[in-house]
Amino acid sequence: MQETTVKRDGASPSDAGTPATTAQGLGKLYIRTFGCQMNEYDSDKMADVLRADQGLELTDNPEDADVILFNTCSVREKAQEKVFSDLGRVQHLKKQNPNLVIGVGGCVASQEGEAIVKRAPYVDVVFGPQTLHRLPDLIKRRRAQGVSQVDISFPEIEKFDALPPPRVDGATAFVSIMEGCSKYCSFCVVPYTRGEEVSRPFDDVLLEVADLADQGVKEVTLLGQNVNAYRGAMGDSGEIADFAMLLEYVHEIPGIERIRYTTSHPKEMTQRMVDAYARLPKLVSFLHLPVQAGSDRVLAAMKRGYTALEFKSVVRRLRAARPSLTLSSDFIVGFPGETEEDFQKTMKLIEDVGFDTSFSFVYSRRPGTPAADLHDDTPQDVKLRRLQQLQALINQQAAAIAQGMIGTRQRVLVEGPSRRDPNELMGRTENNRIVNFPGVPRLIGHMVDVVVTHAHTNSLRGRVAGIERDTSGAE
């Protein structure tokens, strides 16, 4: 489970007249984010709505905050306990400052609801992914009534209509194009915490991307739980745009140079989607396509809706359209009833397909899902051994991809200073590899050709094309 703390620079010129505090004394906002890129996007929107309505500025120190929010993820086991552990760490701040507002959002909030307040009565607001736009009203009602507020309803796409215009500082941005999931995989809580699939109107998505491009964004990542299941209404015509059509239109927006998307589902990888990789050069040569397992028996128990052979067929068609395409994926090891033969079929699929860096986990039982009722007799040590074997194979494949990039010329979008050396720069290749290289700050936010000189475990090192060769090998 990924974990991030939302930070943002000071107000833009357009915010110059916004007061830093309100009549209620609000001033600073701290958000801690767990989980996927959808949650990162949602956290940005929480900050946007509270800045617009109450003038809150982000801080990376919870002790300075007037509002503390936890944006939670329920994909992994013990997610709820993690939330209560984090809440316990800020409880003393509530005692020091009774006016402090503490809120819990995201999928754990959606799943647990009022149970959070019962267990942690110092929590002021609980809200779901679909009701984050109501945060200002929830906080105001909490202050006016003195009672904790809980809103975990599913008002479909209402939140997108209520959100302020996007505001970004860099060359990359996320754009949520749909919410929820209607696949109901037997192991997954997402349909229960984020609702069923609802797509944003076609024009709304294009307007947001165009707005971001006007702010200097060059790369957009289109987000959805099953992003390629997008079916957006086109104005009042009654026509529906599929994901391939949306990609075609985003591709034509001036200023946008790269398009990414996540997360996709193999069942929704239509021929029109495959053809997009042959026709749309701005669509990057990288795809995250979760397969979960390589055994048809396990895939059926997971209710994934495809076989291993059908998954391989999708991959073959994609690579025929874009030979340079690299794939990452998700794998669950130790699903209830998984035998050694089932596991070896997953290993065979990995060998046959070839994956870049991927996400793999031992199965986590999620209460309320169909898989939670399945008999699980595989010892934990066996599951851990299988996970280690699977990760070793994927790491080997990822290392081979990285080694194969040495000496190649890569188009890199420079995102900022290197995390390892602030005097150097960091950017990403099309296939989502981080590259660190010497360069001047004026390159930040621009596309640069970089020659890869060294491959490391989690990054590459290179030099700007045309600059004398870098031989340091520093990571």
Curated annotation (Swiss-Prot):
Residues 1-10 have a biased composition (Basic and acidic residues). Disulfide bonds: none annotated. The keyword Transferase applies. [4Fe-4S] cluster 1 binds at residues 36, 73, 107. Its main location: cytoplasm. It comes from the Bacteria. GO terms for cellular component: cytosol. It is found in: Cytoplasm. PROSITE patterns: MTTASE_N (PS51449), MTTASE_RADICAL (PS01278), RADICAL_SAM (PS51918), TRAM (PS50926). Residues 403-466 form the TRAM domain. The keyword Iron-sulfur applies. Pfam families: Radical_SAM, TRAM, UPF0004. GO terms for molecular function: 4 iron, 4 sulfur cluster binding; metal ion binding; N6-isopentenyladenosine methylthiotransferase activity. [4Fe-4S] cluster 2 binds at residues 181, 185, 188. Binds 2 [4Fe-4S] clusters. One cluster is coordinated with 3 cysteines and an exchangeable S-adenosyl-L-methionine. Residues 167-400 form the Radical SAM core domain. Keywords: 4Fe-4S, Cytoplasm, Iron, Iron-sulfur, Metal-binding, S-adenosyl-L-methionine, Transferase, tRNA processing. Its EC number is 2.8.4.3. Residues 27-144 form the MTTase N-terminal domain. Catalyzes the methylthiolation of N6-(dimethylallyl)adenosine (i(6)A), leading to the formation of 2-methylthio-N6-(dimethylallyl)adenosine (ms(2)i(6)A) at position 37 in tRNAs that read codons beginning with uridine. Monomer. PANTHER family: CDK5 REGULATORY SUBUNIT-ASSOCIATED PROTEIN 1 (PTHR43020), MITOCHONDRIAL TRNA METHYLTHIOTRANSFERASE CDK5RAP1 (PTHR43020:SF2). This is tRNA-2-methylthio-N(6)-dimethylallyladenosine synthase.
